[in-house]
Amino acid sequence: MTEFINRLQKVASNPNAFKKTGRGIERETLRFTLGASLSTKPHPEGVGSALTHKYITTDFAESLLEFITPVSNDVDTVLKQLEDVHHYTVSHMGDEKLWPLSMPCFVTHDDDITLAQYGESNVGKLKTTYREGLKRRYGSVMQVISGVHFNFSFSTEFWDELFGEQSEDQRKESVSDAYFALIRNYYRFGWLIPYFFGASPALCSSFIQGRETSMDFESLGKTYYLPYATSLRLSDLGYTNDAQSNLKISLNSVNEYVDGLNKAIRTPSEEFAKIGLKEGDKHIQLNSNVLQIENELYAPIRPKRVTKSGERPSEALERDGVEYIEVRSLDVNPYSPIGVNEDQVRFLDMFLTWTVLSDSAPMNDSEMACWKDNWNKIIEKGRKPGLELKIGCQGERLTQKAWAERVFEDLLVIAKEMDRVNGDDAYQQTHKRLSAMIDDPELTISGRLLAETKAAGGIGVIGCKLAVEHRETHLAHQYRFYTKQELDAEVERSVQAQKEIEANDKLSFSEYLEEYFSYLK
């Protein structure tokens, strides 16, 4: 019996180990107009304050909505919550629509994009100034790429069965070590996510206007594509930061990770210093370090803990260890009105369980570089027949198909255990549908989307068509989890909360920044 099977049987002996898994979803999407251009309207007034609303906020831009679900133990519940919040928002958007693709179209210049606005409070101004810094550092067009983030935590019962009886400190350390083991395996095998669910094989030419690229694109009118690509969003064309590539933050323990993060937020950048901190009285970045704040660190997966008021993410991790992980490699699923579907959630349940129960040796920088090379191959040519990937850095290779099949043998064992606990076959059905995609890459989201793009004559055409269909779906939706009254009440609460924050400010913005960044001294 393998160690993996042994560990799986341990945790599966308690039905609640899987039943109490925690899941939350964050979905980003751009508002755009009937004339197929980016919305220039402010955040819809009817959905409340973007600063304080629990479920409806904005990301980088005023037009870039972000929908957030609370933590749920049930797959159906988290999707119902997302559907309800989409319906409520679209009902307050007039004739504007939600862009259904990760990669933006119709955006040609940074100045087309209004930064997200959060009111007159110091915390609101800090959020907008941070975004101004991102704009000056990397450009706005790159920042309006949309994604889906999946937050995931194992249950207390899961850890109880896996680790047995422990003191509080021992448990904290064991759980953090297990989550970092998961993260290392995610880098080793997470390329399966863009293979199955990558949804950006093509992009509008406006996105790369004036940008250098070494990619050998084929064109179709104003659409550029790579014939076997899965997720150009995750490629060098997407969110990249050369300054960050030298940070080398360790994933071998929570202490090493926090040390690396603390160093990054204190490392000055000559390049960013040239931008300056102010133009007249206006702050244009929070500081000129490699990272303005910890959230600027780009990563396909992050260890997380809910922060207390005024606490930085690294301080929360240092205080009590890892509480959950945030998967950040999902493109927006264009075929789902809410950008993600049940199969994706169930796959991540199985895959993340497999990554935590499988062996996971410590990882050095050179090994990480080898695994990242596999990701890049899948991102740029993942559907190419016979594509070979590295097995670590030892020179051995295996076809992507053979490797996926090996992983799926283990995932089937997990699927059966999860279904046994739930009394149905939902995980095995997901496994079956995804197995078909291993055999036929054209069944993947990127394969399907590229075929439809070619048939329609361009990615923009597909985006507009799906946006109209999804808008009709959202408007016709009947509430399945929340009530209209509950969401109305949250709007009122959020507006009031913003007013209170603004009324309670005592410091000038400059004084507030001085105090906020006192930890850098």
Swiss-Prot record:
EC number: 6.3.2.2
Gene3D superfamilies xrefs: 3.30.590.20
One Gene Ontology term from the biological process aspect of the record: glutathione biosynthetic process
InterPro entries linked to this entry: Gln_synth/guanido_kin_cat_dom, Glu_cys_ligase, Glut_cys_ligase
Catalysed reactions listed for this entry: L-cysteine + L-glutamate + ATP = gamma-L-glutamyl-L-cysteine + ADP + phosphate + H(+)
Keyword field contains Ligase: yes
A Gene Ontology term for the protein's cellular component: cytosol
Cystine bridges: none
Domain of life according to the entry: Bacteria
A GO molecular-function annotation: metal ion binding
Xref: HAMAP family: Glu_cys_ligase
Family to which the UniProt record says this protein belongs: Belongs to the glutamate--cysteine ligase type 1 family. Type 1 subfamily.
Protein name: Glutamate--cysteine ligase
Lineage, top ranks: Bacteria, Pseudomonadati, Pseudomonadota, Gammaproteobacteria, Vibrionales
Gene that specifies this protein: gshA
